[in-house]
């Protein structure tokens, strides 16, 4: 029963964590004024511009927005309670009652807070990269300011791909548009006026290869198929794609973080129960995959590499080397279960 309870706890907390982090980002983005960013970018001197942008974005000494740092209080408390609950449920599998306020869980709570710290550090690095792109990029200060705001909350790689998309669309928009007047064909049918652009869309798309994904290339290809595309249309597309990437990043980080903490919490609870003699001597950890067609081959190999399971204090053999816990890599859905040696 505890396995089902832990799985339910993971699912609910993963969603809650993502929602809370996303809410913190929305609160931060609501404070960012594009006109103020544009005014700063229209100034002289890169160092002066950086200093002005840091004030506008309210960045602390680490380059993290203060509003965002303050907004991590709720996610931090959520993770601290989560790791304690998982450890308690795992310990209960051995019919041992765990003191969730004990010192044994202190390091796990620290790990939970450290996870958010790494997330904020990655965010700060990406904001720094976005600022540099805004300072040295092409386009009007207003356009660069809008792109800077879009990039907030993305990873460095996501921000770079958004810059490539923006440049491609701008190249297309900068190409003159030609109006073909209304006319009547030889059959007497009136053909309404049409717009065409002389842009070489194939060349524009080719210039993005290796810099953005196939899905992103298809997105801008569909946009450039419209000769009536306007700057407002392009901005709407970029705004929406930036939101989607930010959402994906937050969900992925939340899923991965919760998974990692859950597996660590289970092991902690089992080892505490073992220390108090609540587990039989033959109890071992067994690697379990999700058991569907999405399981990667390298992940499916792990059970066979550990046929009898492993002792609680020993790592699993995996294609990536020895690992104490899942996840093996991004998107891993494997987990450890408790049982006797096979």
Per-region residue spans from a language model:
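Acidic, glycine-rich two-metal-ion catalytic cores of nucleic acid-processing enzymes
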Residues: 229-230, 234-342
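N-terminal leader/targeting and assembly helices and adjacent pre-domain segments
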Residues: 1-244, 249, 257, 339-342
